[in-house]
């Protein structure tokens, strides 16, 4: 029987135990620190040991919580110095706190063991908080990682089910998916019907119906019926495997802002450390007040720790990507999220993106005493032997039972229509050209689409309009994009000028370009890119079918309805797991909210640190204020970064 990977479970459990151990250690150190601090403040140590015995007693007692809380920081700092990598937060904390304890050697100044122990304690509290914050922000992506099934059920000759690792299932194998189980591999349903929960992949809370003959993708939960599924892909190429690979690799693609912060920290930390040394040595040499200037230098060191930036900025991007995943929006890296925030031009492919990509009857105009239903029935009977999509849409619109015995002598005139004898009457269903051959002038119709005219015994019975229907949320999406500051919305299509103009007008698009071949779309996007000014970016949205060249060329390629589409997942920078255009505007809002949070944290952290550095140099800031400048600012920045995960109201 297949089971989940025990190594992953063991690693996860070990990490959790390590975090709990650190938390308990810090709580013990905090308790001891509180007791010692109270004894020191209330004069108990002075009463017990006198002067200067109270100072040495205080030194020893504060050293206990200091070592309990910070031994791992001191150990890491020592190891890094041995490796030649001194300038990190562990080194800064070690030097600053040991220096605070060493101030006891200067009899002309107040002892600072309490500050030294407090700096280490609160630094560790901040580190613990950061660990919890990162863990929380990973939950949405961890939930996404849980879509990977542990096994697949394969029916044996004796009728029993054997649980097999999905990797071991060959293409074409029929697997059994019980109610409540995840679909392990992409395939087609050969027996059964059910409701599918696709929330983990698409963010869609409404279950989707599925029946025999329907395609089914891995990662969905079978909610009701027992399914027999014939696999169409190996597990490694299934939707769930591709999505997991995408999510796991997202952290490798860094945003420009993220890379800047990393480079900045490499310069900032040694620069401030050097400034601290110059401040302490220079001030001491000039004034002779060594204890005062060394204390200022130590305060500099505490504030110089860059953790508020190096933690909160990546955490903001991580939270934004995780929050987007809740909506079924997979962003391949923080660099694409950053670019998405600057998008001011959105280019759409029409079919399958703004429209449903399927023909359907949008209007029925009967004449000569026919009703809508009777006109549809005559047309559906005439088209009953055709497999053309237009014929199928007419039969679907009729919805009633069709008796093929009523039809005789059916002929198909390619590019024009069909002629058939129905109940002894000669019926012609076709376009305006076929009508002209019969000597009848086609009436005008204001509705744009493919028009089927119906003649019964040379009498005009009416016409049926068939079109690719616009998606229900497409019009609102365009309004939302304009409201979000997108300056230009453009539609590219291979359809006629008339159809394109109708769709563009209905949706409120800024411009459209019709009768384009796939290669023409790339050229059109190139021209739009050349017209971009400033930092504005261009996003192209397609359904993943034949859109790879344009998706790749755009600043941001967005593939819609990508469930099961390997080409789309490969070519796009952002993958929308369902076919709702509304998620495009939501993805842009997530990106802009994330970038706003990133810059809030950068400005806040640098502003506070710069202020405290100036105050420390002037001798106004003490070690306690430095603790706020480091740990306090880091915690506030992290709390702000966690807001990036909140996407419910976007």
What name fits each language-model region?
Residues 1-54, 64, 161-163, 241, ...:
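Flexible metal-binding regulatory segments at protein termini and peripheral loops
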Residues 2-16, 62-151, 170-175, 182, ...:
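Actuator/coupling domain of P-type ATPases
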Residues 30-31, 259-290, 296-314, 599-628:
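Bilayer-spanning, highly hydrophobic alpha-helical transmembrane segments
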Residues 77, 112, 133, 152, ...:
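Residue-level signature of catalytic and energy-coupling elements of molecular machines
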Residues 78-88, 129-143, 315-334, 642-650:
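Juxtamembrane helix-loop transition segments at the membrane interface in multi-pass membrane proteins
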Residues 89-94, 201, 260, 295, ...:
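Conserved catalytic phosphorylation-site environment of P-type ATPases
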Residues 178, 365-488, 497, 509-525:
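P-type ATPase nucleotide-binding
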Residues 424, 456-600, 608:
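Conserved ATP-binding TGD loop and adjacent catalytic N/P-domain core of P-type ATPases
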